[in-house]
From Swiss-Prot:
One of its GO terms (biological process) is bacterial-type flagellum-dependent cell motility. The keyword Membrane does not apply. InterPro entries: FliE (IPR001624). This is Flagellar hook-basal body complex protein FliE. The gene is fliE. It comes from Rhizobium rhizogenes (strain K84 / ATCC BAA-868) (Agrobacterium radiobacter).
Amino acid sequence: MIDAIKNVSSLSATRGLGSIATDLSSAASNAIASTPETAIGSSAVGSFASVMSDVAKNTVSTLKEAENASFAGIKGTMSTREVVDKVMQADQTLQTAIALRDKMVSAFLDITKMQI
Protein backbone atom coordinates (compact mmCIF):
# COMPACT_ATOMS: atom_id res chain seq x y z
CA MET A 1 0.00 0.00 0.00
CA ILE A 2 2.64 2.51 1.03
CA ASP A 3 4.88 1.47 -1.88
CA ALA A 4 2.65 3.56 -4.14
CA ILE A 5 4.23 6.66 -2.60
CA LYS A 6 7.33 7.03 -4.75
CA ASN A 7 8.02 10.76 -4.40
CA VAL A 8 6.58 13.92 -3.02
CA SER A 9 6.80 15.99 -6.17
CA SER A 10 3.28 17.31 -5.64
CA LEU A 11 4.66 19.44 -2.81
CA SER A 12 6.73 21.51 -5.22
CA ALA A 13 5.45 23.42 -8.22
CA THR A 14 8.36 22.63 -10.54
CA ARG A 15 10.26 19.67 -9.13
CA GLY A 16 10.19 17.13 -6.33
CA LEU A 17 11.71 17.58 -2.92
CA GLY A 18 14.33 14.97 -3.68
CA SER A 19 15.93 17.14 -6.32
CA ILE A 20 15.92 20.10 -3.95
CA ALA A 21 17.68 18.01 -1.33
CA THR A 22 20.33 16.84 -3.80
CA ASP A 23 20.91 20.38 -5.06
CA LEU A 24 21.47 21.63 -1.54
CA SER A 25 23.34 18.67 -0.07
CA SER A 26 26.74 20.22 -0.69
CA ALA A 27 25.64 23.51 0.87
CA ALA A 28 24.32 21.66 3.92
CA SER A 29 27.52 19.66 4.36
CA ASN A 30 29.58 22.85 4.07
CA ALA A 31 27.35 24.53 6.66
CA ILE A 32 27.83 21.72 9.15
CA ALA A 33 31.61 21.97 8.87
CA SER A 34 31.69 25.76 9.14
CA THR A 35 31.16 28.15 12.02
CA PRO A 36 27.63 29.23 13.01
CA GLU A 37 28.12 32.71 11.56
CA THR A 38 29.04 31.43 8.11
CA ALA A 39 26.50 28.62 8.26
CA ILE A 40 23.67 31.09 8.67
CA GLY A 41 24.81 33.10 5.67
CA SER A 42 25.58 30.18 3.36
CA SER A 43 22.69 27.75 3.82
CA ALA A 44 19.79 29.83 5.08
CA VAL A 45 18.10 29.58 1.69
CA GLY A 46 18.07 25.78 1.46
CA SER A 47 17.73 24.71 5.06
CA PHE A 48 13.93 24.83 5.20
CA ALA A 49 13.52 22.85 1.97
CA SER A 50 15.97 20.19 3.09
CA VAL A 51 14.31 19.87 6.49
CA MET A 52 10.89 19.48 4.87
CA SER A 53 12.30 16.90 2.48
CA ASP A 54 13.83 14.93 5.35
CA VAL A 55 10.58 15.06 7.33
CA ALA A 56 8.57 13.77 4.36
CA LYS A 57 11.05 10.97 3.64
CA ASN A 58 11.21 9.98 7.32
CA THR A 59 7.42 9.88 7.54
CA VAL A 60 7.08 7.67 4.48
CA SER A 61 9.82 5.30 5.64
CA THR A 62 8.28 5.01 9.11
CA LEU A 63 4.88 4.21 7.60
CA LYS A 64 6.46 1.57 5.35
CA GLU A 65 8.21 -0.01 8.34
CA ALA A 66 4.92 -0.15 10.25
CA GLU A 67 3.14 -1.71 7.29
CA ASN A 68 5.86 -4.34 6.88
CA ALA A 69 5.75 -5.04 10.61
CA SER A 70 1.99 -5.52 10.52
CA PHE A 71 2.32 -8.02 7.67
CA ALA A 72 5.09 -9.80 9.58
CA GLY A 73 2.81 -9.92 12.62
CA ILE A 74 0.03 -11.45 10.55
CA LYS A 75 2.43 -14.10 9.25
CA GLY A 76 3.68 -14.77 12.78
CA THR A 77 7.31 -13.83 12.12
CA MET A 78 7.24 -10.80 14.45
CA SER A 79 6.01 -10.55 18.02
CA THR A 80 2.92 -8.58 18.89
CA ARG A 81 4.90 -6.16 21.04
CA GLU A 82 7.24 -5.29 18.16
CA VAL A 83 4.30 -4.77 15.80
CA VAL A 84 2.56 -2.49 18.29
CA ASP A 85 5.79 -0.52 18.81
CA LYS A 86 6.22 0.03 15.06
CA VAL A 87 2.58 0.99 14.54
CA MET A 88 2.60 3.40 17.49
CA GLN A 89 5.82 4.97 16.19
CA ALA A 90 4.21 5.39 12.76
CA ASP A 91 1.12 6.91 14.35
CA GLN A 92 3.23 9.40 16.29
CA THR A 93 5.20 10.31 13.15
CA LEU A 94 2.01 10.77 11.16
CA GLN A 95 0.47 12.97 13.86
CA THR A 96 3.63 15.10 13.86
CA ALA A 97 3.48 15.47 10.07
CA ILE A 98 -0.19 16.45 10.26
CA ALA A 99 0.52 19.03 12.96
CA LEU A 100 3.38 20.44 10.89
CA ARG A 101 1.12 20.65 7.84
CA ASP A 102 -1.57 22.44 9.85
CA LYS A 103 0.96 24.97 11.17
CA MET A 104 2.27 25.62 7.66
CA VAL A 105 -1.23 26.14 6.28
CA SER A 106 -2.08 28.45 9.16
CA ALA A 107 1.10 30.48 8.57
CA PHE A 108 0.35 30.69 4.85
CA LEU A 109 -3.17 31.93 5.54
CA ASP A 110 -1.82 34.53 7.96
CA ILE A 111 0.61 35.76 5.32
CA THR A 112 -2.11 36.00 2.67
CA LYS A 113 -4.24 38.10 5.03
CA MET A 114 -1.47 40.67 5.52
CA GLN A 115 -1.94 44.05 3.91
CA ILE A 116 0.67 45.28 1.50
